[in-house]
Amino acid sequence: SGFIKENEEAAGEGLFLAVRGPLSRQKLLDQGFKCPEIYGDPALLLPRIYNPLKNKQYKVGIIPHYIDQDNKWLDQFKDDPSINIIDILDPTVCNFVDEIKKCEIILSSSLHGIVCGDAYGVPSYWIKLSNKVIGKGFKFKDYFLSVKRNDKKPIIIKKNTKLDSVINHRLIKDYKIDIDLDLLYKVCPFKGIH
């Protein structure tokens, strides 16, 4: 739904109905494409398709990007009943959503962990577990602009970073997303798929 990195180019022809955010739109315009000023990651529409009631079971959900899943910092939480390590590669979207909804907050190095948290009203924060995720944060910044979040950079996680210091980090603050999801839904080409 958008570019991953700043120096990327669109491949071939395309009809653009919406894009992740204004940074992706500007890149398309600069490359000669037409692109309406309609923003939003399609995952923000998930609650219109699937929105079960779930009780909160975990203080924190951690969603590592697939490239970060073997990060040693995560090992300390494997047996902690208050922490839910959520697999971004879960092939069942419903299971993934259920696990997010069971958490009080989400810490994620995966953009879609943050997007899905936002979609379901679970406060979600960008963490950086490694330098392996490509794009220097371009897709995160693009998304944050689309929903009018003020996030500019991730919370850096190191091997000895304590979870309490992350939860109490100055970047962890209340926010509310602000985006016209009706407009995004109106142009959505996969309406009615359940």
Features from the language model and the residues they span:
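Active-site anion-handling motifs in enzyme catalytic cores
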Residues: 1-194
